[in-house]
From Swiss-Prot:
One of its GO terms (biological process) is DNA replication. Isoform G2P plays an essential role in viral DNA replication. Binds the origin of replication and cleaves the dsDNA replicative form I (RFI) and becomes covalently bound to it via phosphotyrosine bond, generating the dsDNA replicative form II (RFII). In turn, viral DNA replication initiates at the 3'-OH of the cleavage site. After one round of rolling circle synthesis, protein G2P is linked to the newly synthesized ssDNA and joins the ends of the displaced strand to generate a circular single-stranded molecule ready to be packed into a virion. This is Replication-associated protein G2P. It catalyses: ATP + (deoxyribonucleotide)n-3'-hydroxyl + 5'-phospho-(deoxyribonucleotide)m = (deoxyribonucleotide)n+m + AMP + diphosphate. It comes from Enterobacteria phage fd. Its EC number is 3.1.21.-, 6.5.1.1. The lineage of its organism: Viruses, Monodnaviria, Loebvirae, Hofneiviricota, Faserviricetes. Belongs to the inovirus G2P protein family. One of its GO terms (molecular function) is DNA ligase (ATP) activity. Pfam families: G2P_X_C (PF05155), Phage_CRI (PF05144).
Length: 410
């Protein structure tokens, strides 16, 4: 699906001026004039107040703002113009979120995604929209996202952990951008950045953030989004999903042969897809091809202890003063269980204080895990090919209850 679309709409020629900067001719617009014509607010780096009451402002700029839609927001910013940046308005959003309130799955229709951004932008800011040469709109970035499905969240987390050490050729893991449920490659690349992450974890985080807001302070689209995200069927579909996201910049789009003009790109996509292919999926495959080669022949040690974790959590939990359930003690016992799996019963017994060891063993036995089983845990038979879990099936990216979204204007 198209998970992010960044478009740049240049200003009409009559508003664009030029100036010489060294040997470079710089195109720019007068931001104060744009603000007057469109009604937009600007920021000023310097404001001077004179004794006669006059104000002088300098260093005008426009910060990113968010336009509300039915389900989500569209970010936009006015750029004055510089050596490497033609004066324009940049708009960016997740078309999936704008169209349906979530990005667990979504459309690969470039025309529909573009329409969702442009029509909402035109409807919200018609005066600014009229100052732009819409036909000259260019694509600045496309995020193409597809998912592999692990048997459960426990194994999905292990896949992410294994991917942290995978790289190939020019595709390098960016360790400073890696979190518990996310791995990033080529973070600073001007061509494409690759990301793998757990969708169910992200979805739960979004729900938690929205739920923590007082209802009176939530916007109408945030309320709609929370309603969509809380759908049990959606949460079930997201469980076990390992997302592979390609953030594709203009240089990489051009190397694939995609025109950067939006409307030329839409025509290109239409012709391309008529051949029985899918442009967005092939762009995604092109972006990940080097990294996926590293998966061939690779294997990882997989353990599926979700049933064990459930048993421990059902026995060892506490209720906090705020009424929430804490599984801190269960997490410690499960960590001990994992040590038994990886290091062996006898080895762990030799490296822990005797009283602590027996206390942890007793806690696991209380959960219904026989001591004889704890003494014979092994990972020897759990080595499986990595590609078994990195199988991105294009035909199963959406549930059977999916319908192509219909554009709603806020």
């Amino acid at each position: 699906m198209i998970d992010m679309l960044v478009l740049r709409l240049p200003f009409i020629d009559s508003l664009v001026c030029s100036r010489l900067s060294g040997n470079d001719l710089i195109a720019f617009v007068d931001l104060s004039k744009i603000a007057t014509l469109s009604g937009m607010n600007l920021s000023a780096r310097t404001v001077e107040y004179h004794i006669d009451g006059d104000l002088t402002v300098s260093g005008l700029s426009h910060p990113f703002e968010s336009l509300p839609t039915h389900y989500s927001g569209i970010a936009f910013k006015i750029y004055e113009g510089s050596k490497n940046f033609y004066p324009c308005v940049e708009i960016k959003a997740s078309p999936a979120k704008v169209l349906q309130g979530h990005n667990v799955f979504g459309t690969t229709d470039l025309a529909l995604c573009s329409e969702a951004l442009l029509l909402n932008f035109a409807n919200s800011l018609p005066c600014l929209y009229d100052l732009l040469d819409v036909n000259a709109t260019t694509i600045s970035r496309i995020d193409a996202t597809f998912s592999a499905r692990a048997p459960n969240e426990n194994i999905a987390k292990q896949v992410i952990d294994h991917l942290r050490n995978v790289s190939n050729g020019q595709t390098k893991s960016t360790r400073s951008q890696n979190w518990e449920s996310t791995v990033t490659w080529n973070e600073t690349s001007r061509h494409r950045t690759l990301v793998a992450y757990l969708k169910h974890v992200e979805l739960q985080h979004q729900i938690q953030q929205l739920s923590s807001k007082p209802s009176a302070k939530m916007t109408s689209y945030q309320k709609e989004q929370l309603k969509v995200l809380s759908n049990p069927d959606l949460l079930e579909f997201a469980s076990g999903l390992v997302r592979f996201e390609a953030r594709i910049e203009t240089r990489y789009l051009k190397s694939f042969g995609l025109p950067l003009n939006l409307f030329d790109a839409i025509r290109f996509a239409s012709d391309y897809n008529r051949q029985g292919k899918d442009l967005i999926f092939d762009l995604w495959s092109f972006s990940f091809s080097e990294l996926f080669k590293a998966f061939e022949g690779d294997s990882m040690n997989i353990y599926d202890d979700s049933a064990v974790l459930d048993a421990i959590q059902s026995k060892h939990f506490t209720i906090t003063p705020s009424g929430k359930t804490s599984f801190a003690k269960a997490s410690r016992y499960f960590g001990f269980y994992r040590r038994l799996v990886n290091e062996g019963y006898d080895s762990v017994a030799l490296t822990m204080p005797r009283n602590s060891f027996w206390r942890y063993v007793s806690a696991l036995v209380e959960c219904g895990i026989p001591k004889s089983q704890l003494m014979n845990l092994s990972t020897c038979n759990n080595v499986v090919p990595l590609v078994r879990f990195i199988n991105v099936d294009f035909s199963s990216q959406r549930p059977d209850w999916y319908n192509e979204p219909v554009l709603k204007i806020a």
